[in-house]
């Protein structure tokens, strides 16, 4: 979902994935598209969530404080809100997904 000042992204996170990386886009059974991401961190005490938000911030070139977890703190599917110019962030995400 893209707004003027932010974008919300659904992420399918794989903790202990061997490396920190964005692996592209996947289609869920219900038709939703999700960003596939893996992180080295384990899914304990919020470590994987922190690694996810750090990776997304670094990849998009935004401050870590501009990435927040909106839903899915203990689930594999997570909703992240990234604050900034929504259209610019969406375009950057599309480029990243095309490369993955």
Residue positions per predicted region:
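The alpha-helix within a helix-turn-helix
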Residues: 57
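Contiguous, often N-terminal, cationic amphipathic patches that form binding interfaces
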Residues: 1-54, 68-74, 79-100
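Short acidic capping loops at alpha-helix termini that bridge into adjacent secondary structure
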Residues: 64-66
């Amino acid at each position: 979902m893209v707004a003027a000042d932010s974008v919300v992204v659904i992420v399918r996170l794989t903790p202990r994935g061997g490396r920190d990386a964005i692996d592209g886009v996947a289609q869920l059974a219900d038709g939703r598209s999700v960003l596939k991401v893996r992180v080295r961190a384990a899914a304990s005490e919020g470590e994987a969530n922190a690694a996810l938000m750090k990776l997304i911030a670094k990849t998009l070139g935004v401050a870590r404080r501009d990435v927040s977890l909106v839903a899915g703190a203990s689930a594999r599917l997570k909703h992240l809100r990234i604050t900034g110019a929504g259209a610019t962030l969406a375009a950057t995400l599309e480029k990243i997904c095309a490369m993955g």
